[in-house]
């Protein structure tokens, strides 16, 4: 399905320092991007927390950055704050844009490209695919309280990349292997609505996590995203949410 992304913030980044600037600011290894390729990542705080989730594509002599509309102004402000002495220019891009999703596995691989998309972001079918892919919505599934390695962004972290803002705490936790929580998929019995923040319980840990997003799956169950403590995040395990049994799923599923 072609999902409309016309509301997303998009910037064309040019200038002689464009690659070095983005390499030192984002988690994305832009130096490794071939022309036409793209990568997902984040801009982090110095303490390693996720300030904004972004996609960067290399197109000729420019980089194209895309992010959700809700964090577009914040993202540009972060770029401009760090671009003090750098030869970089940020140009807003407007007009129709879309992203093509075929299945949960394809979601994170799909670039944001020009052209109208026929399916709105709010469509239930889009939401089901989004949740099964672990494609996060900023402010719901990830915010400044989270580290990238707790989220599906972990699959894109390049630990051979050089220094960038927030890199040290990310690398330290990776070396120690002691992340306390992670985002997981959940299949919940029943299709009654689940609220954001609903508590996840387990016999071994009463406060095992909380729900961030949920939608009726259309088959009598509910599918959801939620952060689970490492003691209960094993795939195939069961937890309880509002008195309902839920099975833990790997992302994507």
Which residues make up each language-model segment?
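A generic structural signal for short beta-strands and their flanking turns/coil linkers
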Residues: 7-9, 39, 52, 61, ...
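Short glycine-/aliphatic-rich beta-strand segments at the starts of folded cytosolic domains
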Residues: 4-25, 91-102, 178-189
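Acidic, low-complexity central loop/insert segments
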Residues: 2-3, 9-10, 52-136, 240
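Short, intrinsically disordered, mixed-charge
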Residues: 23, 27-31, 71-73, 77-85, ...
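Glycine-rich, small/acidic residue-mixed loop/short-helix segments
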Residues: 49, 151-157, 165-167, 171-253
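Short, conserved charged micro-motifs
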Residues: 17-22, 72-76, 113-117, 192-197, ...
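Acidic, proline/glycine-enriched N-terminal capping motif
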Residues: 1-53
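Anionic-ligand-binding alpha/beta catalytic cores of soluble enzymes and soluble regulatory domains
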Residues: 111-187
């Amino acid at each position: 399905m072609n999902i409309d992304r016309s509301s997303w913030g998009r910037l064309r980044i040019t200038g002689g320092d464009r690659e070095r600037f983005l390499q030192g600011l984002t988690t994305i290894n832009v130096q490794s991007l071939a022309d036409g390729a793209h990568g997902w990542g984040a801009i982090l705080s110095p303490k390693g927390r996720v300030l904004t989730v972004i996609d960067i594509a290399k197109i000729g002599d420019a980089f194209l950055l895309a992010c959700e509309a809700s964090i577009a102004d914040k993202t540009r402000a972060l770029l401009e704050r760090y671009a003090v002495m750098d030869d970089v220019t940020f140009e807003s891009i407007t007009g129709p844009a879309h992203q093509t999703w075929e299945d949960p596995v394809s979601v994170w691989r799909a670039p944001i490209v020009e052209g109208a998309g026929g399916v709105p972001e709010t469509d239930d079918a889009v939401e089901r695919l989004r949740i099964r892919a672990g494609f996060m919505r900023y402010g719901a599934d990830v915010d400044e309280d989270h580290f990238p390695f707790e989220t599906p962004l972990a699959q894109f972290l390049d630990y051979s990349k050089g220094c960038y803002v927030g890199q040290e705490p990310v690398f330290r936790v990776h070396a120690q292997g002691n992340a306390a929580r992670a985002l997981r998929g959940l299949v919940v019995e029943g299709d009654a609505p689940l609220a954001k923040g609903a508590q996840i319980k387990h016999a071994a840990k009463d406060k095992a996590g909380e729900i961030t997003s949920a939608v009726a799956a259309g088959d009598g169950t509910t599918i959801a995203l939620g952060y689970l403590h490492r003691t209960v995040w094993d795939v195939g395990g069961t937890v309880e949410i509002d008195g309902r049994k839920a099975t833990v799923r790997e992302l994507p599923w």
